[in-house]
Structure formats: structure tokens, C-alpha cells
């Protein structure tokens, strides 16, 4: 992002492409199950977005995805749409995605501006994924408590089964981000 002129055409295109990637992966059914936990691809894109785009562009991409869903396009999980999703049982996760994009994107920007050794880049990006996951789970747990009226213990229990797979998705997002940022270093936030 140019500090003098705001968003450039490239920034807008990247925001739109990453919002579209998240939307497309939302409607693809889980590719397999691990016990009762589905392995859906959408969370990989959610974690990849701030790693590659940074805080502002990453937050805008997640925000655009949410806006498109709120305005009625069926881009939320299971083909859902509308403002009701934001205040439904899983709405907190969407809020967590937005928070995570800004916070993890800021961490990614700091990490990438320090120009870590290529061999260490995936490790640093995994740290970014962990920051993102903390924000997502924080939003999701608070959303379950507020919108589904679950207790803290019940909300934590509802999420525990997903943590392992989300860590695997974080590793995949790190590997993809490393490849993208190595091939296109000018994308770095």
C-alpha cells in the first residue's frame, strides 16, 4: 500500500481475489473427516490472507467477504447469507476472522519487514497463524457464549475438537504463504 496515495489498483485486486478465495472455499464441502471433525479448506484461506496481504489489505479482504455475505450472496458456510449469520451461533467466528486478519496481519508485517532467513520464514509465519487462531477462537467462543447462550466451559468444549486440524491448516497456510512470498516478494506487506 502506498502511504501517499492510499490503495492502488493492485491492492484492490488482491483484496477482491482473497475475498473470493475465502468465499469459494466456504462452499466446497469438507474434503474428509477426522472422526466427527470435518477438514474444510476455508480456514486455510482465512489464515493465508493476513500472512500474504498484511493487516490492512488482509482485514479489508475478510471484511469484503463478510460484507458480500451480509448483503445476501450465499458465501458463508453451508451457503448461508444475511446479517443473521453475524449474530448466529457461529457469527463470533466471522468477527474473530476480522480481528485475526488485522492482528495477525500486523504481526506478519513486522516479521516480514525484518526479512527473516528463508529457512525461518515458515516458522515465523506459523507464529502468525497461531496469533490468527487465537483471535478466531476468541471471537468464536465469545460468539457461542453471546449468541448461543453457552457457558464458557461448553463453548470451550465445542471448539476443542477443531484445534488440531486448525493447527494443520495453519501449517499448510504457512507453506503456501512461504511459496507465494518467495515467488512474489513485492506482495509482502
Regions found by a protein language model. Give the residues of each.
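Generic alpha-helical transmembrane segments of integral inner-membrane proteins
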Residues: 16, 20, 24, 48, ...
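Short helix-perturbing small/polar motifs within transmembrane alpha-helices
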Residues: 1-2, 17, 24, 83-136
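Interfacial aromatic-anchored transmembrane helix boundaries in multi-pass membrane proteins
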Residues: 26-38, 66-100
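Helix-loop junctions at the membrane-solvent interface of multi-pass transporters
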Residues: 28, 52, 78-79, 107, ...
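Hydrophobic transmembrane alpha-helices
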Residues: 1-59
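Membrane-embedded alpha-helical hairpins and interfacial helices in multi-pass inner-membrane proteins
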Residues: 35, 110-188
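Hydrophobic alpha-helical transmembrane segments
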Residues: 12-17, 32-48, 59-64, 67-75, 102-122, ...
